[in-house]
Regions:
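Conserved long hydrophobic alpha-helices within structured protein cores
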Residues: 76-84, 104-105, 109
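C-terminal extracellular loops and terminal segments
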Residues: 1-80, 137-139
């Protein structure tokens, strides 16, 4: 038994369990065009795969003196997002200026960005119940426009 006789302990089996809260695989492909002087337009696609739900261990979900299994966190479905950007450099009254903008999530896709497993430790359960997983969805289409003047 680990520790001193008057200490509580729990053995947690977690060999081979994936890290939660971070995509294990990401890929990004971007392209930029300069069709004429001062103007740029581009897009990039980011793919998120093998992303697992966040989980945590605490005294409230452990059985002291027992061997517990850490369950494989719930796997978030593969997702991706297409973003677009453009900028134009010009002069206003002899001052350098840039007008630029971004469109994030151009295709307005709703996908699970994060997930949370509230209970991932068990003595006898071998799989996470997907009905108990909380989801956080990505924002839909968003955009911003900027005007920068150097003086």
């Amino acid at each position: 038994e680990p520790g001193a006789p008057d200490h509580q302990y729990a053995i947690i089996k977690m060999k081979g369990i994936n890290v939660g809260g971070s995509a294990q695989t990401t890929a990004n492909l971007g392209v930029t065009f300069k069709p004429f002087k001062g103007f740029r337009i581009g897009a990039e696609y980011t793919l998120y795969d093998r992303n697992y739900a966040y989980y945590s261990l605490s005294g409230s979900n452990l059985s002291m003196g027992k061997t517990m299994n850490l369950l494989e966190p719930w796997r978030v479905p593969t997702a991706g997002q297409l973003d677009m950007r453009a900028s134009y450099h010009f002069q206003i009254g002899g001052l350098n200026a840039t007008l630029s903008g971004n469109i994030n999530n151009l295709l307005n896709q709703y996908y699970i960005e994060k997930a949370w497993n509230p209970s991932t430790v068990s003595e006898n359960i071998t799989e996470v119940n997907a009905d108990n997983v909380y989801f956080y969805f990505a924002k839909g289409l968003t955009y911003n426009i900027r005007l920068k003047i150097n003086f």
